[in-house]
Amino acid sequence: MQKDKGLDEIDRRILRVLRKQARLANNELAEKVGLSPSPCWTRVRRLEDAGYIDSYVAVLNQAQLGLGDTVIIEVTLDRHDEDQIQKFGQALAELPEVLEAYLTTGEYDYFIKVAVDGTAGYERFLRERLYKVPGIRHSRSSFALKCLKRELSPVP
């Protein structure tokens, strides 16, 4: 979707509030952004219809689920043809531990963020899942020590 230059400051306020508190009732949202409920509801529907709001999601607590460690993995494939890239991307999409995966430029082909239960959980993920995906030539991993910022999306 192309950037809509029609976003005004109230639209941006709505998006900022919903980004953090998607379960707010319309009356509460309207109060927070300085609108009455009816125009607020209309604006939210317009933002949804225009594609600015893709979905409303629950952000799960990884530690509570026994997956308190985040690992960033950089992967290089042995081939770079379209078929290999397609198959590798499909395989990543099927791995439940994978939170995010990006095809990238630079030294590595992929940037993958996974949630695991410690080093033992990470070793299990590598042996039983990731390294069974064909085509990996090299990987490098880093455990995240602390999350300093996490946003699902920016608001201009």
What residue ranges belong to the model's regions?
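A compositional/biophysical signature of low hydrophobicity enriched in polar/charged and small residues
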Residues: M1-P156
